[in-house]
């Protein structure tokens, strides 16, 4: 099935947002949340972020299956990510905002990418791969 230009632009936009989301999350985790001498805090942040960002995705997928409103959830996720990363907040509030924001973004972004791609796995691969590039870029920016 052929995908039209408008849909291609939307998938590219979602993929670019994925790069930004994962880059911002990686940078924030390293730059703001791991800054400590305590190994205990590092473990709590690592487990907390990954639990919120990844293990909560089935729950948010279920919620969105029930109520829809993906555009609202996408907007909320981006706001959570900006607030959690751009403002000086307590460590665990920032952790919560970027973790949950990341989870919601991945559910909505993945659904839209699959839907908009109309069976063309190239575009789903684009969405996924730019997220991985974002992780690498966020880590690189932190280290430089």
Model-derived regions: residue spans:
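Glycine-rich segments within core transmembrane alpha-helices of 12-TM secondary carriers
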Residues: 119-143
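Intracellular juxtamembrane helix-capping segments at the cytosolic ends
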Residues: 103-118
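C-terminal ends and interior cores of transmembrane alpha-helices
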Residues: 76-92
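Helical-face signature of the major facilitator-like transporter fold
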Residues: 14-18, 22, 50, 91-103, ...
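Small-residue-mediated transmembrane helix hinge/kink sites in multi-pass secondary transporters
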Residues: 58-65, 111, 139-143
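Cytoplasmic membrane-interface "Motif A"-like loop-to-helix N-cap segments
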Residues: 65-78
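Central cavity-lining transmembrane alpha-helices of secondary-active solute carriers
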Residues: 43-64
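Helix-loop boundary and gating motifs at the non-cytosolic
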Residues: 2-50
């Amino acid at each position: 099935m052929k995908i039209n230009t408008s849909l291609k632009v939307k998938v590219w936009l979602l993929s670019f947002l994925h790069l930004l989301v994962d880059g911002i999350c990686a940078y924030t985790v390293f730059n703001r949340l791991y800054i400590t001498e305590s190994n205990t805090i590092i473990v709590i942040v690592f487990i907390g972020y990954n639990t919120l960002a990844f293990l909560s995705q089935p729950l948010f997928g279920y919620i969105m299956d029930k109520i829809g409103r993906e555009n609202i959830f996408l907007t909320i996720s981006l706001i959570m990510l900006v607030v959690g990363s751009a403002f000086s907040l307590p460590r665990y509030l920032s952790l919560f905002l970027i973790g949950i924001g990341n989870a919601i973004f991945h559910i909505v972004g993945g659904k839209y990418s699959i839907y908009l791609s109309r069976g063309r796995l190239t575009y789903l691969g684009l969405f996924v791969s730019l997220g991985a590039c974002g992780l690498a870029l966020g880590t690189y920016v932190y280290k430089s």
